[in-house]
Amino acid sequence: MIESLNTMINEKYPQSELTGKIIGCCMEVHRILGNGFQEVIYQRALAIEMNQKQISYSREHEMAIFYKGQEIGTRRVDFFVEGKIMVELKAIICLEDVHLAQAINYLEAYSMDIGLLINFGARSLEFKRVMKPGIKS
């Protein structure tokens, strides 16, 4: 039963295995620390957790933002995992639509297909898997 469920998940979502590992790391961080800390504390703890799970990443990865082919600024991604997935962390009471829209805009700006929006600030870990519009799930 588990194998067929995993197959369905893998067929339905691109990079589901890697996003699942990242979410698992986030769950462990939230289990140990709970909510109530600043975002940077969760960033540091998640870096430790991903190192232990041998997940490669760059942290505070600066990326250029382009408009009509011209660079108009930069933005730092909390984590850029294995060159495939953007991970944006929050430490707020609850995620709102504006945070989801922001994550989707980052995917567009960085020409990336998949991202995770993670919130450590709620009593239970909140996470949203985001995909650039037009990517088939």
PLM feature spans:
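Nucleic-acid nuclease catalytic cores
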Residues: 90-137
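Well-ordered beta-strand positions
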Residues: 58, 78-80, 119
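Solvent-exposed, charged helical/coil patches
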Residues: 1-56, 125, 131-137
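A short acidic/basic microdomain associated with nuclease active sites
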Residues: 53-66
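Conserved catalytic cores of phosphodiester-cleaving nucleases, focusing on short active-site segments
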Residues: 34, 79-95, 106
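A short, glycine/Asx- and small/polar-enriched loop/turn
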Residues: 54, 71-75
